[in-house]
Amino acid sequence: MACVAAGLLLAGAATEPSATAAKKKNKGSVKKEAFGKTKDGKAVEAYTLVNKNGFKARIITYGAMLTEMHVPDKDGILGDVVLGHDNLESYLDGHPYFGVTTGRVANRIAKGKFILDGKEYTLAINNDPNHLHGGTEGIDKKVWSARVSRSKAGPAVAFSYTSPDGEEGYPGSLKMKVTYTLTNDDELR
């Protein structure tokens, strides 16, 4: 049930020095680097996708979160258009859901309760008196696994996370997968 903002269509083509090599290869690239550690010591990584035109997107394994998207302005100069932070610590101290994958449910569940198959479930309350975007420790606050993949469309990274039975009060385990692809047509999907 993970929601991801997708289908961002970008116009124009520009490059910056760090993207020139990827453009020459005509297929794009994915760069992995350390982004910090959670309070319980889990390593968080950043994956930067660069397409053949030099467009860039960065996604971190914490919340499968989009933290950067570089697109050209009217003069062809690339700039980051994503609201967010430059470091993990700022996300760990609380964030307004910038660029995250939310779930198990996006939006509010009134009073943190729902009935499924005749049984009432009580969820974590994090938007008094409601449950919002998966709860206090929702999937936006989990470290996801990541795997680099490539397709004809452009460079991609697949993120996966399994929410165990009972996490934040939800019944059943749920396997989730989110794939970010930066197409060579300058779309992030």
Regions found by a protein language model. Name each.
Residues 11-13, 17-21:
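Boundary at the C-terminal end of the N-terminal hydrophobic targeting segment
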Residues 19-189:
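Surface-exposed acidic/polar loop and edge beta-strand patches at domain peripheries
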Residues 2-12:
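Bacterial N-terminal signal peptides
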